UniProtKB/Swiss-Prot annotation:
The lineage of its organism: Bacteria, Pseudomonadati, Pseudomonadota, Gammaproteobacteria, Enterobacterales. This is Maltose/maltodextrin-binding periplasmic protein. Residues 1-26 form the signal peptide. Part of the ABC transporter complex MalEFGK involved in maltose/maltodextrin import. Binds maltose and higher maltodextrins such as maltotriose. It comes from the Bacteria. Belongs to the bacterial solute-binding protein 1 family. Gene3D superfamilies: Periplasmic binding protein-like II. Keywords: Periplasm, Signal, Sugar transport, Transport. GO terms for cellular component: ATP-binding cassette (ABC) transporter complex; ATP-binding cassette (ABC) transporter complex, substrate-binding subunit-containing; maltose transport complex; membrane; outer membrane-bounded periplasmic space; periplasmic space. InterPro entries: Maltose/Cyclodextrin-bd, SBP, SBP_1_CS.
Length: 396
């Protein structure tokens, strides 16, 4: 079903409160490209890249942003339908690949060398490349320049800094303690890890959740709470509000938080996360990726579009102008974007971080580590007990 772009946008807004029926989406068919990307990304910019592709090749490109596309894709792709190209965070792609829904991609070495090597690791599943890395997200330390012109380089400096700021009615640091995505950089700094990654594969029995490094990181976090430098019940909205009102000097968050801080008029900077025991904090790294549907009859066209139109300075610039991508996988365009110190810091933290594993076992990891951190932070369990239980849950 072909719908003109303007009409489609109207149709989409009318359907926001309804489930997007499969019939409302363009069908997979030879000789045209259908792309799905989430509604919070620069889909209008991506459509501009599609127009250039159509002008050069005569191949029509339709960009759609269906609701819950990450759940819809496996349903429709399993029946041989859906988009030719799907954009989503890389960690869902392992499950798709396991179900046989993604085509293996074969970019040549010259093309692979245009992108940062660690981004290719994010889209490798059982040793095979299953998507193209596009953009990179990681947590950074965000600080209020008026309260704290020089942010601390180490976690160990934070207790003394908090005492100084408390004397002025402020606090040093508030961030989301309820979700392990935010607490993991500290837990992983001295040697914690989710699943061991070797030779392009994850060993699901080699889990680093209760090793000495993970225990040291979580113990430090618990001590910050015990010593009243942080509150165990701090969640995302509490931490965001405190930082954006100028009540706390620092928070830990990602590029998605910048627009709200801009609106709040806080004079802020984004920098590298503090070290712990001399080791860099290791945030989980998410990579916005583009996979090709195994059922697509247009795999070569999809490859041409992604390699020679989207993953170019001009292509990524069109998407970025619509909605900021953050840091990007393409070295040449990242060098341009990194003139913004916020983006340079995001990439630096990502390069020091841990690629979020793209395996189904991560759901057990999130559940177990969330419980462990909350129990240790509240004093319901010791750090050793909490992490031992988490390790057992993940590996059982």
């Amino acid at each position: 079903m072909k719908i003109k772009t303007g009409a489609r946008i109207l149709a989409l807004s009318a359907l926001t409160t309804m489930m997007f029926s499969a019939s409302a989406l363009a069908k997979i068919e030879e000789g045209k490209l259908v792309i799905w990307i989430n509604g919070d990304k620069g889909y209008n910019g991506l459509a501009e890249v599609g127009k250039k592709f159509e002008k050069d090749t005569g191949i029509k490109v339709t960009v759609e942003h269906p609701d819950k596309l990450e759940e819809k894709f496996p349903q429709v792709a399993a029946t041989g339908d859906g988009p030719d190209i799907i954009f989503w965070a890389h960690d869902r792609f392992g499950g798709y690949a396991q179900s046989g829904l993604l085509a293996e991609i074969t970019p040549d070495k010259a093309f692979q060398d245009k992108l940062y090597p660690f981004t290719w690791d994010a889209v490798r599943y059982n040793g095979k490349l299953i998507a193209y890395p596009i953009a990179v997200e990681a947590l950074s330390l965000i600080y209020n320049k008026d309260l704290l012109p020089n942010p601390p380089k180490t976690w160990e400096e934070i207790p003394a800094l908090d005492k100084e700021l408390k004397a002025k009615g402020k606090s040093a640091l508030m961030f989301n303690l309820q979700e392990p995505y935010f607490t993991w950089p500290l837990i992983a700094a001295d040697g914690g890890y989710a699943f061991k990654y070797e030779n392009g594969k994850y060993d699901i029995k080699d889990v680093g959740v209760d090793n000495a490094g993970a225990k040291a990181g979580l113990t430090f976090l618990v001590d910050l709470i015990k010593n009243k430098h942080m509150n165990a019940d701090t969640d995302y909205s509490i931490a965001e509000a405190a930082f954006n009102k100028g009540e706390t000097a620092m928070t830990i968050n990602g590029p998605w938080a910048w627009s709200n801080i801009d609106t709040s008029k806080v004079n802020y900077g984004v920098t590298v996360l503090p070290t712990f025991k001399g080791q860099p904090s290791k945030p989980f790294v998410g990579v916005l990726s583009a996979g090709i549907n195994a059922a697509s009859p247009n795999k070569e066209l999809a490859k041409e579009f992604l390699e020679n139109y989207l993953l170019t300075d001009e292509g990524l610039e069109a998407v970025n102008k619509d909605k900021p991508l953050g840091a990007v996988a393409l070295k040449s365009y990242e060098e341009e974007l990194a003139k913004d110190p916020r983006i340079a810091a995001t990439m630096e933290n990502a390069q020091k971080g841990e690629i979020m594993p793209n395996i189904p076992q991560m759901s057990a990891f999130w559940y177990a580590v969330r419980t462990a951190v909350i129990n240790a932070a509240s004093g319901r369990q010791t750090v050793d007990e909490a992490l031992k239980d988490a390790q057992t849950r993940i590996t059982k």
